[in-house]
């Protein structure tokens, strides 16, 4: 399934397909000409998918480099962003090259922020691997890092060139990560999609949801797309959480 996010300045597609990660090289080649590509991921996701993703990209003609940050919220910081800037500079990435965010919401926020600020902005792609990131945070262009004073205090709005969602990645998620995504799905269904609400009500457990993930993720992405198209900058949202 392919959905288009249509915006005044930059439109892009959400590709939702079981097994899509196995063809990531072909997908990226459809968006970019062969060039240098930096992959930002975390240590957990790297062990699962890093080598395979690099192999696919190289087979499609891309020159790749990969950096894995520590998994978890602690990596969503200005200090980690600085490490990533240094890495991109060492790899000699220019504005004609690209960056891929491979991971959950932390990686997506962090990599998107780095891509939007490195050399005043380079092209990037989102490849979310958690349910929450697939139905929410990878779509819409919000990027941010935390500071000691607040969560999401420093950030940008920067739209990716595309989003690739492979429901197969949910099979390696911890149950609590699946539940985090389910909470967002339930919220979306309650607010905007009665049919999705009834569909969720018919599921027996988390495993049942994962088995029907492509259908459910697609429904949620349609909701998120509509929200983003209506108000790209979500001007009424307040996403920073000040710390005392």
Predicted segments, located by residue:
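Generic structural signal for well-ordered, non-membrane alpha-helical segments
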Residues: 21, 46, 50, 81, ...
């Amino acid at each position: 399934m392919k959905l288009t996010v249509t915006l005044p300045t930059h439109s892009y597609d959400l590709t939702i397909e079981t097994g899509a990660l196995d063809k990531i090289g072909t997908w990226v080649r459809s968006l970019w000409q062969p060039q240098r590509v930096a992959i930002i991921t975390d240590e957990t996701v790297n062990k699962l998918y890093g080598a395979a993703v690099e192999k696919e990209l190289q087979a499609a003609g891309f020159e790749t480099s990969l950096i894995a940050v520590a998994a978890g919220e602690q990596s969503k910081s200005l200090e980690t962003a600085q490490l990533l800037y240094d890495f991109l500079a060492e790899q000699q990435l220019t504005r004609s090259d690209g960056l891929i965010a491979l991971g959950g919401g932390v990686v997506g926020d962090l990599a998107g922020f780095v891509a939007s600020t490195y050399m005043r902005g380079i092209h990037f792609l989102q490849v979310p691997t958690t349910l929450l990131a697939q139905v929410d945070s990878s779509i819409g262009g919000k990027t941010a890092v935390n500071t000691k004073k607040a969560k999401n205090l420093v950030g940008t709005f920067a739209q990716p060139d595309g989003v690739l969602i492979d429901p197969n990645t949910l099979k390696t998620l911890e149950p609590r990560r699946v539940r985090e995504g389910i909470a967002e799905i339930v919220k979306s269904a309650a607010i905007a999609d009665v049919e999705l609400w009834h569909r969720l009500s018919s599921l027996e457990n988390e495993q049942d949801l994962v088995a029907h993930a492509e259908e459910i993720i697609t429904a949620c992405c349609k909701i998120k797309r509509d929200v983003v198209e209506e108000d790209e900058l979500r001007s009424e949202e307040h996403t920073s959480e000040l710390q005392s």
